[in-house]
Amino acid sequence: MGQQKQRNRRWVLASRPHGAPVPENFRLEEDDVATPGEGQVLLRTVYLSLDPYMRGRMSDEPSYSPPVDIGGVMVGGTVSRVVESNHPDYQSGDWVLGYSGWQDYDISSGDDLVKLGDHPQNPSWSLGVLGMPGFTAYMGLLDIGQPKEGETLVVAAATGPVGATVGQIGKLKGCRVVGVAGGAEKCRHATEVLGFDVCLDHHADDFAEQLAKACPKGIDIYYENVGGKVFDAVLPLLNTSARIPVCGLVSSYNATELPPGPDRLPLLMATVLKKRIRLQGFIIAQDYGHRIHEFQREMGQWVKEDKIHYREEITDGLENAPQTFIGLLKGKNFGKVVIRVAGDD
């Protein structure tokens, strides 16, 4: 009797969401694990990163990256172990960073893999503070924001993996850091653990008034990854020559139409002109991929010296990926969201 083949579970895009994603937009499929060919490796996913950008990849509107095809495996960064290798640079047991997506196993040519060393202490951190979110925080703040000692930095989504890192780098550079988060618990974490000077709950009815009070000298840098009413409150407080790095607009990812209310574009453009504001969007891989080693060197040192604190929210089981992702887009997460797909033995 032949040995039973291993099975590969994968979440595919069943339909494109209209508004917020729902469980029916995803479908769990299963088939035999493929065998690697010449020059290929078979990977077993250990950790899967869930990130807001994935919502954009579920839509077929023009964007900086192609959409996931209907029936295609959902995209996502992964930390995996090599199970079988026909590639000279990899051997069984190697830890690698890649983009296998929402599935148990994947076949790779090795071209898109990064080795993590034989015994990485916290392998999942390569999906967070030492990976794409940390890199996004680092380059957006330091290259576009260009913080100077004594300036006021406002950070949206202050306890998320990007915002938390932005705020802590801002403190290292001597800024007064004002965080914005959803709820008292997250705000306490921002001030007591991350070292923010102030953190405000954007759910408060008088949020705009609280922000003005927290920024008596105005705002020099606003790190934007949310949009919506937070930006509305920030706009009148911006100082001359303020900088606004834009890495995301989570509040509008599920929008199907423009929000009701007055047209804010004329005020925005007038403010940008009169105050000579630098407002710049960026895509981390395309714009700063060539500086990844600079980031890894400096961030790795900061983490080693305990100058950067990092919080993960790990959910066990690939089967829980869709519901966890839906919760992420609703702001239910607290820290970097990771799915533990398999044990790391």
Swiss-Prot record:
InterPro entries in the cross-refs: ADH-like_C, ADH_N_2, GroES-like_sf, MDR_fam, NAD(P)-bd_dom_sf, PKS_ER
Class of this enzyme: oxidoreductase
Effect of C247A: Exhibits a reduction of about 50% in activity, but is not inhibited by 5,5'-dithio-bis-2-nitrobenzoate
Notes on activation and inhibition: Inhibited by thiol-specific reagents (p-chloromercuribenzoate and 5,5'-dithio-bis-2-nitrobenzoate).
Molecular functions per Gene Ontology: curcumin reductase (NADP+) activity
Comment on pH dependence: Optimum pH is 5.9. The enzyme is most stable in the pH range of 4.5 to 12.0, with 90% of the initial activity being retained even at pH 12.0.
Keywords: NADP, Oxidoreductase
Notes on temperature effects: Optimum temperature is 35 degrees Celsius. The enzyme is most stable from 10 to 50 degrees Celsius.
Short name of any one Pfam family annotated for the protein: ADH_zinc_N
Catalytic reaction list: tetrahydrocurcumin + 2 NADP(+) = curcumin + 2 NADPH + 2 H(+); tetrahydrocurcumin + NADP(+) = dihydrocurcumin + NADPH + H(+); dihydrocurcumin + NADP(+) = curcumin + NADPH + H(+)
Residues at which NADP(+) binds: K186, N225, N333
Entry EC no(s): 1.3.1.n3
Chain spans, region Disordered: 1-24
Bias (Basic residues) ranges: 1-10
Family (UniProt): Belongs to the NADP-dependent oxidoreductase L4BD family.
Functional summary from the UniProt entry: Catalyzes the metal-independent reduction of curcumin to dihydrocurcumin (DHC) as an intermediate product, followed by further reduction to tetrahydrocurcumin (THC) as an end product. It also acts on 3-octene-2-one, 3-hepten-2-one, resveratrol, and trans-2-octenal.
Subunit organization: Homodimer.
Protein name: NADPH-dependent curcumin reductase
Species this chain originates from: Escherichia coli (strain K12)
Source lineage: Bacteria, Pseudomonadati, Pseudomonadota, Gammaproteobacteria, Enterobacterales
